[in-house]
């Protein structure tokens, strides 16, 4: 295991001195700033992980997401073993979401996973005592990927997103998360009641755009459920 060096190239396993905006070292901090501006990762909440060259880049836990720097990230292999960690003086810890991230990578072959503490998700779950949310008839459904069919939904199809119950610790969500993945093979997201949402895709662009689509759909779903004053 190595520490991050000043040029972000601490080993010959993976060159991290890539200036490309799409490199996880640069991309994760940028996306976290965008998500913070949208109100999805405030108060140190939320997280993101991206697979790159068979290695997993993970944002740190318990930090202000809008202030994450490229050398704050953790890198581990597909077996969950740390390969590169931030320098000790930073006193950072790996995201508590890591077990769910890894579950998405192994169970769904995801390329990226995003976790947000969206107020819209929490509101929608409060309005839905059931263990799923059903949405129909909206154009933005076409922006959501059906993992079972391997294509995006049509706007006349029913979109079903599972809800699992929250737990004291993120790692304790893994079992119910796996059950939801098996029960809902079409889903690209899981809602956690009173908590937030996990969304994933084959690359970083897919969960980002789907997250935006889900937020839109959830706002409309909430509007339809709340009776007019």
From Swiss-Prot:
KW Amino-acid biosynthesis (keyword) present: yes
Record EC number: 4.2.1.109
Any one cellular-component term (Gene Ontology): cytoplasm
Enzyme class: lyase
Keyword Lipoprotein belongs to the record: no
GO biological process assignments: L-methionine salvage from methylthioadenosine
Cofactor note: Binds 1 zinc ion per subunit.
Catalytic reactions on record: 5-(methylsulfanyl)-D-ribulose 1-phosphate = 5-methylsulfanyl-2,3-dioxopentyl phosphate + H2O
An example Gene Ontology molecular-function term: zinc ion binding
Residues the entry annotates as binding Zn(2+): 115, 117, 195
Keyword vocabulary terms for this entry: Amino-acid biosynthesis, Cytoplasm, Lyase, Metal-binding, Methionine biosynthesis, Zinc
Compartments, as annotated in UniProt: Cytoplasm
Binding residue positions for substrate: 97
Disulfide bonds: none
NCBIfam families from the UniProt entry: salvage_mtnB
Family designation: Belongs to the aldolase class II family. MtnB subfamily.
Name of this chain's protein: Probable methylthioribulose-1-phosphate dehydratase
Native organism: Acyrthosiphon pisum
Lineage of the species this protein comes from: Eukaryota, Metazoa, Ecdysozoa, Arthropoda, Hexapoda
